[in-house]
Amino acid sequence: MKVLLVNGSGHAKGCTYTALEEVAGALEKNGIETEIIQVGTQPIAGCIGCNACLKNGKCFREDGVNEFVEKAKTADGFVFGSPVHYASASGMITSFLDRAFYGKSALFQGKPGACIVSCRRGGASAAFDQLNKYFTINCMPVVSSQYWNQVHGNTPEEVKQDLEGMQTMRTLGNNMAWLLKCIEAGKAAGVDFPEREPAQKTNFIR
């Protein structure tokens, strides 16, 4: 089994990476393969609603989203990480997730998802709530921890001093590994993911 961890920070080895690395370490101790993907240093354009991804199976932009989507096909779980910018996730990870989930939402359904956020001081819970919405609109089991998945610090060294935050990351990794193994055991026992009904659309203005 494999989990993809996505770093949406502009600092490839900064605070967000430090938190993701702690999650990855816990997953690997439980026998889960991991890969940390850096996207925050790349210019990621937002979705323009052209629907090319729905027609052609991929976004017309070639900036890393399509490459991630290919890897997502064989991944079993996901952790998305972001620094906190104005009490929100970074613009880069937001654009990245908008396009990945809009174009290929079926790839993520039934697979566990989690997010982590990193901040110097405040705004973590608002950014955390924002990122979780990608999972809860897409039939993904959301993996939780002992607290909201956040770390505090202005440098990687300061993040490592956030003992509760780092423990929260390890607990998150352990919980995701447990859920992945439960899903695998369920499949082996003949328990499949619930079949979805045909989608119903409600517009408030007709």
Name each model feature, range by range.
Residues 2-30:
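N-terminal beta1-alpha1 ligand-phosphate binding loop
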Residues 6-9, 39, 117-120:
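Cofactor-binding loop segments of dinucleotide-utilizing enzymes, especially the Rossmann-like FAD-
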Residues 32-42:
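A short beta-strand-loop structural module common to alpha/beta enzyme folds
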Residues 42-72, 199-206:
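Cysteine-cluster motifs in flexible loop/terminal segments that predominantly coordinate metals
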Residues 51-55, 132, 161-162:
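Short, hinge-like loop/turn segments at secondary-structure boundaries
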Residues 60-147:
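Helix-loop-strand module that forms the ligand-binding subsite of alpha/beta enzymes
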Residues 141-206:
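Glycine-rich phosphate/pyrophosphate-binding loop and the adjoining helix
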